[in-house]
Amino acid sequence: MLQICNFLHNFSHLLVIYAPNLIEFREFKTQGDFMKKIIALSTVAFLSTALYADAAMQKQIDELTKKLEVMEKKQDRNIQKIGEVNALAAKDNIKFDVDFRTSYDNLQYKTASGQKYKNDGLYSNRLWLGMGYAPTDTMVFKGQLAYHKAFGAAANSSSGMPQRGMGFDTFDWISSEALNDDKLRVREVYWLWTPTVGSFPMTVSVGRRPSTGGYLVNLRDDDTSKSPMGHVINMEFDGASAGVSLDKFVTGMNFKLCLGRGLTNAKSWANQADSATQVNMQTPTSPNYIKEDGALDTIDMAGFIFVPYDDGQYAVSTTWYRGFNVPGLTYGGSTNPANPAAPHIMALKTVGDMDGMAISAKVEGIGDGINDFLDETILFASFAASITHPDNITSHMTPMGPVQAATMLGSTDSETGTSFWLGAQLPNLTGGKFGLEYNHGSKYWRPFTYGEDTMIGSKLAARGDAYEAYWTQPLIKDVFSMQVRYTYIKYKYTGSDGFFGDGGTPMTMSEAQAMGMDPVEKAQDIRVYFRYRY
């Protein structure tokens, strides 16, 4: 084709050049014949030139196409190599993230008699160092190290001196939540397997599970929701979970079985050494890690989380659990057996089992595209209950004499407590979030919320009324933020933050005063924090 175009192109140009000479020796019948010849020759010249240009362009296009095909093949090979490198890097390296918060808290307390206590300036630092590793698409390792410490302070156990007094700062359930020393502690560490069995996506996980900052609590805490429902569970523990997605039947439906262990009854390594009679040496006479009689029984927990519906805007979640062999402070021996009215020692003993349950509903976005404000508004409501099952077998002493049955929350009967919780989170003009919350607890209400992020005790455990308002504001994108929070609790009964024994006995303020006590009736915490996350 290209050769034909070249011939026609050259021939037409020759005709145009020599046509004037040729027509001098020819005769034309009319001037019109002469013009027709000229037009014909010009047309041939134009068409041949255009045809030649099209063919040349086609040749260039063909050459470029071949070059592009070669480049695409090289690019595909490069992309494959880059993917292999990225996959190798992801599998060979643990990825870290940092969450560092500096807080100021102003604490105010008022007792039933009107006595006031305060701390005008409690400063603290909290560090969460997260880590993750995904060797395959269905297997993930997750971990988080934590440090939470008051400025310049050390825990009692650090030096043996009571720099901050006695307490339960190092109790395992809250060791990373309460103010402690300057050591990094393992707050979370677990593996997560996400297989698909049949057509059902599943999850299986074992380790120190993410059991604080759960559902709905995460809104105020400005975090992604963790596994448990925050109305009843907010504490650290070791355990396992197995879940299945039932989304093919109902939108967002899923079921998860949860198991946990809050304490292990086992003696320590080389726990006892007695002097041997035959040889002059110390010899261990008790095997390692066996069960120890008289100590707290192993504390276990079993339950489930069932989400019947969740479409991203409307969601309902339910949970039930039982805590086995939960502990409580019970009356021990008298400090003066000869005087029945003398003070009695409180001992931590196993007191029974505890059931808990909750149902929570959340609306994330009011209406359907009415306006941005309603689209970003979140409303929620939650109802929960707790039921005691006392053992009634541990003997203890009271000012009235020996009693053969230890109480559970001050009662030898099974008691039921209830709580409801309402909240709203609203967007503001500065890109932040403004929240309001209210909760109420009854006389025998007792959740497992010891790890709640407050300095005045768990507001969700309050036997009375709690009010809270907060403003969370991003300062530098999603990397640096601040929050101002006000929490106010008015207790109707004592024992809100106690364990499950006599120390958790509910009494009205007047009943407690009649027994010579002066319990806290009102508490408030004003908090300001700045938080860096990357």
Protein language model annotation of sequence segments:
Residues 103-126, 132-201, 211-231, 344-349, ...:
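Surface-exposed loop and membrane-interface regions of Gram-negative outer-membrane beta-barrel proteins
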